[in-house]
Each structure stands twice: as structure tokens, then as C-alpha cells.
Amino acid sequence: MLEKETINFEKTIIVGIVTQNQSEEKLKEYLDELEFLTFTAGGEVVKRFSQKMERPNPKTFLGTGKIEEINLYVLENGISTIVFDDELTPSQQKNISKIIDCKILDRTHLILDIFAQRAETSYARTQVELAQCIYLLPRLSGMWTHLERQKGGIGMRGPGETEIETDRRIVRDRIALLKEKIKIIDKQQATQRGNRGAMVRVALVGYTNVGKSTLMNAVGKSDVFVENKLFATLDTTVRKVVIKNLPFLLSDTVGFIRKLPTQLVDSFKSTLDEVREADLLLHVVDISHQDFEDHIDAVNKILLDIKSADKPTIMVFNKIDAYKHLTIDADDLMTERTSKHYTLQEWKNTWMNKVGEQNALFISATNKENFEEFRKKVYETVREIHITRFPYNKFLYPDYEDAIDKEEEQDQD
């Protein structure tokens, strides 16, 4: 599980619903993630609210009684922000704001806000601003009037903060301008990718906060920002990496997440092009997270959406040093054994059977456990792709064993 440091941030409550399609257990998983998203954005979750419903209320998302209960809690406890786990319609957000006098955000808005904080380059900031404008355009009529007296804080950051006004025409013009700006930069990025020469391209993909940047640093000996927060990496980092005299390009891409806003998928076209144009994907998984299989499914869904699901892929199960599983007492005859009771070896057997023994690696990027095995597998796969793609390349690569012998001789000297 993700560990949080104690900081006095905005007092926030988070809200979700249990439906026929979303069990209480699944809601808890989503709210755990939403709480960490809130922490990453600068909020401290002090209370959770949930309600069982067949479907969301089209007017206020929750039932009238639950809305009143939340409103009373907000008034009595000085809550500044409410975050709903599902995306609210513009009318739902407007109706809730009429009843509860605080910032009303949803999961999409929160993720956009985090991206706004994390954007370092001009290009990333432009992408985020476009996503924010597209999201906020249908919500302008009620949202900004209600929030104008609540300056700053969660949900109010980013490049688009000062530009967004209640005039829809101005925002539409801004969207058109940003799209044109991104189109120009995309062409430049495509040209740059085309000029990288005859080298195999490898992309690190995976759920957010699974250790991709740590792995990037360990493999590429580069200095990529690493932090135990969601979306610590936003701008794509590309490094030339050499393993055993074999050079290739390694890119560390933005982490995926469940319920990833479509606005971000559309806006971050060039970032995702690093994945689309890769010859090999290293799908990094935090096996110590209790929901890691759901995370794999979420990543695979996005890879399918961007037409990259059929690329050669190595599953890299990271953080094996932190893996823990549930146990059942010997005299407990009632508890049913599930995948949450699997040992690490059982997971190894499961995934090696599922994707092939050579395509499932179990490592710890932090303490370098099984790291040489990982480097060897990457080397062998990249070398095979290189020989296939560039059969007439004059640069000859030694066999792996020869390279090891040569490296050992150099070390002895």
C-alpha cells in the first residue's frame, strides 16, 4: 500500500457509490486510490461517504438524504472540498453546489489538477490546459460563479486557471488555439523521433506509482524525478541506454490509472506516441499492491485504446521486496483461499504460464534484486529486434556471453 506523510492540507471528504456493477469491496479500492490522489493534489481526507444505489441520481448523483447528511458534516467540520469518485455531469455539479457551499470536484477534475501541478515543460502545460478547457467548457455556467470567492487550492491550479472565463466563445477560441499549438509541436516531436537513427525503441508503461522512474534510473543511469506520489512523472523522458555494448532508446512515460479522463488521452497524443512507436514495451507492475491485477487490466485497456496492445511486451513485476500476502491459520476451515493468499512463487507460476516464462520477470528496482536477469532479458530481446529490423546494420554486437567475459576482463584490469 501507498504510505502517506502527515501534512496539514485542505480538509476534504471523498464520496462514492455501491451499485450492481460496483461492489463495496471494489468501492473501497477506488476510494483508497481517490484518497491518495487527493493527497497528491494537496488535500487531507478526513471522511468518506458512500451510498448503495441502483444507479446515480441524475440530479444530484446521491440521494437527497445523503446530500443533506454531507452538507451538515461540511458545515460542522469546516470542509473546503468534496471529491466524487465518478465523473459528475455539469447539471449534477451545479445542483450539488446549490446545496453544499464548498468546492465540488470529481475524479476527472482532480486528476487534471494533479497533471497541472506536475507539468514541467511548455508542451506538457499546453496539453494539460487543453484537457482542462475541454472538461470545464460545459461546466462554466455554474462552477466558476460558485468558486470565484474560493481562490486557489485543489482543482483551481494549472495554466488554464487565469484564462478560463464564463464566456464560452472565449474558451472555444482558446481550445482551437491550443489544438493548433499542439498540432505544430506534435509534428516537431514526430520529426525528432524520426531522427533518432537506427536504434530499437523501448517504452516503460504501467500504472501510476509502480516504480517506472526508479527502473529508468537503474537501467539508464539517468536522473529522473522519483517520488511516492501519483503521476510524479508527467513529461516523457527518453534516454539512450547501453547494455553489454547494445545501444537502444528507453522512454519513461506517464503512468496510467483507472478511469483515466478521455481528455488526457486525447491531449497527450505525442506522449502516447512514444508507446505507439515503441518496438518493445516493458509493462511495469507493482506486485506489492493488492489491486495489481486490476492495474494490469487498466493499462491493457488503454494500450488497446491507443492500438498498442499487440506490441511485444515483457511483464516486469516490481517491488517483490515489499510483497506480502494474507495467511490462513491451520485450524481455520471456513476461510476460502483466494488470490490474495498467493505466495510470490504462486504468482510467478501463474504469470509465467499466462504470458510465457521468458516474458514475466520478478524484480526489485530499489534493491536491484534479480536485476541482472532483467538486464539480460532486455538485452536479448532488444538485440533480436535490432537484428530483425536492421539486418544490414554494420554495427556488430557480440554474443551476450562474450560481452560478459570482456566486461569481467576489463574489471580485472
From Swiss-Prot:
The UniProt annotation places GTP binding at: 206-213, 231-235, 252-255, 318-321, 364-366
Q: Which domain of life is it from?
A: Bacteria
Where in or outside the cell it occurs: the entry states: Cytoplasm
Q: Which residues bind Mg(2+)?
A: S213, T233
What is a GO molecular function of this protein?
Answer: GTP binding
Query: Sorted alphabetically, which keywords does the UniProt record give?
Result: Cytoplasm, GTP-binding, Magnesium, Metal-binding, Nucleotide-binding
Q: Which CDD domains match?
A: HflX
Subunit structure of this chain's protein: Monomer. Associates with the 50S ribosomal subunit.
**Protein name according to UniProt:** GTPase HflX
Record the organism.
Flavobacterium psychrophilum (strain ATCC 49511 / DSM 21280 / CIP 103535 / JIP02/86)
Write the gene name: hflX
